[in-house]
Structures are given as C-alpha cells and as structure tokens.
C-alpha cells in the first residue's frame, strides 16, 4: 500500500478522530477509522491501527472497544472534562 503524505501524523490524526467522532455512547468501526484517516491523506491497515490504539492507551487515552453483531466499535470512554464541567467553565 502506498504511503500517504501525512504518514508521520497518523497517530495524532487517529487520536483526533477518536476524540471528535466518538463518546461513551457512540463508537466508530475500523473501516470508518481507515476512511477518516484517508481523508487526511494517511494510508493505514487494520493491524497498524490496532498497534496505534494500544499506544494511545499506553499514553493514557481511555480507548475501549465493544462488539455489536459482527462489527467492533471503538470509542473514548472518558474525557479530560465532562460536559457539566465545561459548562461550569464557560459560565
């Protein structure tokens, strides 16, 4: 598979995708992750994304997975701030 222009940024883009497109109630599939990375001109295979998710977990990002039928969904379970805390900061 040809490498994209932004390959060195793959881990950061993956973190952004997980933070922006998921929460404890909404996950994202591996195919959706791959498509999202392609929009950043980053090519990736499932195995490399599994390793990247493990690295993000080691870094402290609370990435969890769950199965729904045949699909596995990934999501960020906890955030730096909860919605109520953000509202308090804004007020």
Label the predicted regions:
Residues 1-91:
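Short, basic/aromatic recognition patches that contact phosphate-bearing ligands
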